[in-house]
Amino acid sequence: MDAFSLKKDNRKKFQDKQKLKRKHATPSDRKYRLLNRQKEEKATTEEKDQDQEQPALKSNEDRYYEDPVLEDPHSAVANAELNKVLKDVLKNRLQQNDDATAVNNVANKDTLKIKDLKQMNTDELNRWLGRQNTTSAITAAEPESLVVPIHVQGDHDRAGKKISAPSTDLPEELETDQDFLDGLL
């Protein structure tokens, strides 16, 4: 016998046993089978009631006027309050900096949308965030001003002269503590 025939025979035997159990059921089997049917009927009626109580879906029209990423129905009240506070802060900052045109347009709206943020360049975003004296392009002179670490192989250089420790801007108390800890090492 192949595997398919064996499975088929086993299914048939199982179904026959189940039929015999149903035919020759004891009173307690009948009772519990009846209780299970009643539970299933209640569950199906509750599901039907839930399907009928399902709220009507919103139209697609609102998605053209609201940004669904920023909107959360559970925190709509909090968002409204936050938008008012942010709008006031933004207007105060704009009064200080009148040269930002895109930022002015955003401040006049009730809600800030992702589309508005994407349309702003870095200077406008920095003005909107309230950052001052920021540049939008990195100059080539900045990498040269980085501090290059000094690799010291000991207290003496190759010529045998003692190398002085690099000067730091630490207070004297911290320097003494640092010297003490270096001595322990």
Curated annotation (Swiss-Prot):
For the modification N-acetylmethionine, which residues carry it?
Answer: M1
- Listed as disulfide-bonded, the cysteine pairs are none
- The biased composition feature labelled Acidic residues covers 170-185
List the Pfam families: DUF5364
Specify where the region named Disordered lies, as residue ranges: 1-71, 155-185
Q: What keywords are assigned to this protein?
A: Acetylation
Q: Composition bias, kind Basic and acidic residues: at what positions?
A: 1-18, 26-47, 59-71
By its UniProt entry, which InterPro entries does this protein fall under?
DUF5364 (IPR035303)
Provide one Gene Ontology cellular component: cytoplasm
Recite the other comments.
Present with 1100 molecules/cell in log phase SD medium.
What name does UniProt use for this protein? Uncharacterized protein YER034W
Which species is this UniProt entry from?
Answer: Saccharomyces cerevisiae (strain ATCC 204508 / S288c)
Source lineage: Eukaryota, Fungi, Dikarya, Ascomycota, Saccharomycotina
